[in-house]
UniProtKB/Swiss-Prot annotation:
Active site: E55
Biological function: Catalyzes the deamination of adenosine to inosine at the wobble position 34 of tRNA(Arg2).
PANTHER family: CYTOSINE DEAMINASE FAMILY MEMBER, TRNA-SPECIFIC ADENOSINE DEAMINASE
Binding residue positions for Zn(2+): H53, C83, C86
EC number: 3.5.4.33
Catalyzed reaction equations: adenosine(34) in tRNA + H2O + H(+) = inosine(34) in tRNA + NH4(+)
Protein's name in the database: tRNA-specific adenosine deaminase
Underlying gene: tadA
Cofactor or coenzyme needed: Zn(2+)
GO BP annotations listed: tRNA wobble adenosine to inosine editing
NCBIfam families registered for this protein in UniProt: PRK10860.1 (NF008113)
């Protein structure tokens, strides 16, 4: 198992915590010098805050833990490709590297729809490693949304009876 896979497994553990709460199963860990500085998972539904994405929360926790907004030398591991908001937070917090699992065809801004993390017009760019444990990360999301659709369909059926 590679170092990236090891830390992605930790992000997957966080994603499972989100799923247990009925949240979209996305998890993240932030690592500096081989040490996990912060862990987080999606809490958007729980907190009813649009910015409570795993990446935003893990960056916030890391900044608090380190006492600085500059996360130079940090690697962010996240189970789903960052969205525009999260990619912006990565750039603004100076995260050095982003490693993600599943690609996001609807909102991915680390190479799928666009690549904000390596946009040369910004004063900071992050290295990007994509597709680490992609099947496991993507499988969790697919299963979650499949189950959610099933529940919604059953609820509609019950209403029509």
């Amino acid at each position: 198992m590679t170092q990236d896979e090891l830390y992605m497994k930790e992000a997957i553990k966080e994603a499972k915590k989100a799923e247990e709460k009925g949240e979209v199963p996305i998890g993240a860990v932030l690592v500096i010098n081989g040490e996990i500085i912060a862990r987080a998972h999606n809490l958007r539904e729980t907190e009813q805050r649009s910015i409570a994405h795993a990446e935003m929360l893990v960056i916030d926790e890391a900044c608090k833990a380190l006492g600085t907004w500059r996360l130079e030398g940090a690697t962010l591991y996240v189970t789903l490709e960052p969205c525009p908001m999260c990619a912006g937070a990565v750039v603004l917090s100076r995260v050095e590297k982003v490693v993600f699992g599943a690609f996001d065809p609807k909102g991915g801004c680390s190479g799928t729809l666009m690549n904000l993390l390596q946009e040369e017009r910004f004063n900071h760019q992050a290295e990007v490693v994509s597709g680490v444990l992609e099947e496991e990360c993507g499988g969790m999301l697919s299963a979650f949304f499949r189950e959610l659709r099933k529940k919604k369909k059953a609820a509609r059926k019950n209403l029509s009876e």
